[in-house]
UniProtKB/Swiss-Prot annotation:
Organism whose genome encodes this protein: Bos taurus (Bovine)
Side of membrane Cytoplasmic, spans: 181-210
Name listed for the protein in its UniProt record: Transmembrane protein 169
Primary localization class, coarse: membrane
Region described as Disordered: spans on this chain: 1-84
A Pfam family that the UniProt record links to this protein: TMEM169
Name of the coding gene: TMEM169
Length: 297
């Protein structure tokens, strides 16, 4: 009579295989939870890009004037809405409260696809929009004839000159690094052109010269641009100093590629915005309930 009870007691004890299976399932659930949390955190960390350039096709460029005469900038607004609504459905991109989404139209003047019309989708704050739509006459009126340029104040004076002197070695170092980086990319693009797209004689004559001259050329270019940027940033006012200090490379690589006839080798493209008063009009007729607006400059 005791043996069945003993057998029942033994049957209630969990087997080692059952325990290992439970541990494996628990570990799988933990890993699944961690991966899910990781994906959620990764989605939260993803932010909206500051600017996106969309290249226009030839048909869009040719049909621009009829489209404007019929419906104004309505196609651009629809394009901007489609561009925004897709990521917003995922809840990943959030527009800041004081920011607005605009579409700037311009032409590439230097770099790849020179002369092509582009639409730049960018998120700008109200302050940036005010600076963008500020008329040029107002900036000229502040310094008529250069008389007010030597005024003393919080934003201009000897203390600013002292600050620029202190920043001189820092600007030189940063400009040297940035120029070295863009110069290396430009050199590599030029090397690929002569090595892959030109004739065999270019490959055996120009490519070895480019390799041998790279250290000398890159050091001379980076040092010269660093010294030039350090000297140019010496200023009397904060605004002029900031305008000069934030442009580290001075557009030298793009200018060099345009002079050599190798615009596609430029490490960047320079877009000249088309002048328009559409942004100013949208600012004056701003709707508080409108989250997304597109304009053309």
């Amino acid at each position: 009579m005791e043996e069945p009870a003993l057998v029942e007691g033994q049957s209630q004890l969990p087997s080692p295989h059952h325990n290992s299976l439970r541990k494996a399932m628990a570990a799988a659930l933990v890993l699944d939870g961690e991966s899910t949390m990781g994906r959620r955190k990764k989605k939260k960390k993803e932010s909206r890009p500051e600017s996106i350039i969309i290249y226009r096709s030839e048909s869009e460029t040719l049909d621009e004037e009829p489209g404007e005469s019929e419906g104004g900038d309505q196609p651009k607004e629809e394009e901007g809405d489609d561009f925004i609504d897709y990521p917003m459905d995922d809840g990943v991109w959030n527009v800041p409260v004081d920011s607005r989404y605009v579409t700037l139209t311009g032409t590439i003047t230097r770099g790849k696809k020179k002369g092509q019309m582009v639409d730049i989708h960018v998120t700008l704050t109200e302050k940036e929009l005010q600076e963008l739509t500020k008329p040029k006459a107002s900036s000229r009126e502040t310094t008529p004839g250069g008389r007010k340029a030597c005024q003393l104040g919080a934003d201009r004076g000897p203390h600013v000159v002292l600050w620029t002197l202190v920043c001189l070695p820092v600007v030189f170092l940063l400009s040297f690094v940035v120029s070295f980086y863009y110069g290396t990319i430009t050199w590599y693009n030029i090397f690929l052109v002569y090595n892959e797209e030109r004739t065999f004689w270019h490959k055996i004559s120009c490519c070895p010269c480019l390799i041998l001259c790279y250290p000398v050329l890159i050091m001379a270019m980076a040092s010269s641009l660093g010294l030039y940027a350090a000297v140019v940033q010496l200023s009397w006012s904060w605004e002029a100093w900031w305008q000069a200090a934030r442009d580290m490379e001075k557009g030298f690589c793009g200018w060099l590629c345009s002079k050599l006839g190798l615009e596609d080798c430029s490490p960047y493209s320079i877009v000249e915005l088309l002048e328009s008063d559409n942004i100013s009009g949208n600012l004056s007729n701003k709707d508080a309930t409108q989250e997304i607006e597109t304009s053309a400059v």
